[in-house]
């Protein structure tokens, strides 16, 4: 990888209780990409983000922004980063306009009403500019948080569970905004519980569990490497269990005995499907329909976390 915009080296966070929230994490973020950091609750996602954003102090390790040590020039490095936290923390009595403008000033940026206007319009907040924060819905407050994070024109934007509390329509609008930001050159690192969104939007994916990065790759490469393909057979008559004669096949039975699943290696020279169908015919097991299903990113995520817990 050439010239990552953000480099994390040996990042570790340990508390006096003995808990290790991060265990020597190494991560490079490419300029202009959307990177999805996935993990269960308590995995270390928010801790990592908070360290990079200067909210939490690391026990060990370093953060480089454009190759420069984060601590060596904190003000400059922090001005390059925007953060949309999970919590909706705003002054309830301030207007949308004041909230976003004040955030810009905190980073030493001069007043620029034209830029604030453009930002609010991009996020469909212009009509709400005079509204007080306490008058907004949860979804609109989330948009204001994004506007705050972008007010000082950062190169890197962290989105920590940005879809939390947002309805489906607003969520779609929000992700469209994210796509446009990425098209404009903003580097985006997001965490989300909506893994199907990460599958749709991310260029690369990292999975963190118990403070360790257990997988990181191009999204498509990860899905090709770890994804599995399943043949789903809709049976004409339900079965109580998989017959002993089919014990050598990787079969599972669901749907109250109506649905037979065969998991096969899509990279193998032979999938075995033709042989399986012949054996079903020999056993006089009739079927009504066939279909195949490729593992989703969520399937892969669940398997990775399960394997990690089993190994632990």
Regions found by a protein language model. Give the residues of each.
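Conserved ABC ATPase "signature" region
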Residues: 101, 105-128
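Conserved catalytic motifs of ABC-family nucleotide-binding domains
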Residues: 153
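ABC transporter nucleotide-binding domain
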Residues: 175-265
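Catalytic Walker B motif of ABC-type/P-loop ATPase nucleotide-binding domains
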Residues: 157-160
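Conserved ABC transporter NBD signature motif
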Residues: 61-72, 76-77
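A short, flexible loop at the N-terminus of ABC-type nucleotide-binding domains that lies
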Residues: 1-8, 12-24, 74
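Conserved ABC ATPase signature
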Residues: 132-136
């Amino acid at each position: 990888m050439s010239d990552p915009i953000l480099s994390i080296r040996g990042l570790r966070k340990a508390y006096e209780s003995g808990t290790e929230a991060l265990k020597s994490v190494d991560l490079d973020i490419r300029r202009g990409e959307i990177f999805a950091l996935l993990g269960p609750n308590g995995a270390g996602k928010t801790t990592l983000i908070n360290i990079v954003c200067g909210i939490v102090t690391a026990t060990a390790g370093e953060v480089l922004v454009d190759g420069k040590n984060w601590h060596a020039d904190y003000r400059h490095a922090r001005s390059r980063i925007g953060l949309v936290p999970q919590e909706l923390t705003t002054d309830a009595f301030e207007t949308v306009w004041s909230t976003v403008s004040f955030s810009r000033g905190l980073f030493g940026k001069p007043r620029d009403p034209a830029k604030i206007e453009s930002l609010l319009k991009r996020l469909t907040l212009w009509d709400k500019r005079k509204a007080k924060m306490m008058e907004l819905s949860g979804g609109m407050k989330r948009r204001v948080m994004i506007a705050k994070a972008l007010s000082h024109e950062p190169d890197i934007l962290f989105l920590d569970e940005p879809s939390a509390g947002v309805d489906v329509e607003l969520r779609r609008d929000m992700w469209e905004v994210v796509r446009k930001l990425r098209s404009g050159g903003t580097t985006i690192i997001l965490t989300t519980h909506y893994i199907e969104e990460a599958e749709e939007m991310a260029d690369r994916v990292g999975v963190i569990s118990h403070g360790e990065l257990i997988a990181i790759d191009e999204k498509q490469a990860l899905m090709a490497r770890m994804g599995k393909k399943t043949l789903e057979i809709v049976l004409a008559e339900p079965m109580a269990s998989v017959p002993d004669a089919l014990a050598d096949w990787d079969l599972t039975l669901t749907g109250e005995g109506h649905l037979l699943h065969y998991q096969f290696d899509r990279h193998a020279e032979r999938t075995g499907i033709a042989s399986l169908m012949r054996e079903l015919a020999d056993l006089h097991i009739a079927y009504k329909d066939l279909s195949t299903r490729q593992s989703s990113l969520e399937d892969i995520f669940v398997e990775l976390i399960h394997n990690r817990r089993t190994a632990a």
